[in-house]
């Protein structure tokens, strides 16, 4: 994986996942607070990274974290965007659904555009979404931590990405620890 281009600057991390059929709020809310279920593991990883310190001195953050969610209704959005719940049956769960949302909302184009400034991009998405990301070449070489199917291990390695086999609902505790250590290493 590539080193940070600006070693003394804060480490910029982007975490990407997709929505869930579990809506935690009935009204308007941030996307971060709206989705539960399988998103919970990823939200815990985001919180862990966001609250970590570089050293014993807790005033020096380990990294600056941004969180993006690929939603069935709104496309790809930052997790702090305000959203309303939609029927759980409208949540993407098949290759056809993902392709339809891509046609309507171009989430791959938004991911490609917004991911360029980050030192590390952590991707925890379903297998078909990962295939779409790879096919579109939507993420930069040398900066991605891909939590995905073993089917993509070779392709991830060709792009100088860190491949982690998906464990658990989206991330898994062991993978979360590996990701945390990778971010700690690049932030030193």
Report the location of each language-model feature:
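Peripheral peptide segments
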Residues: 1-188
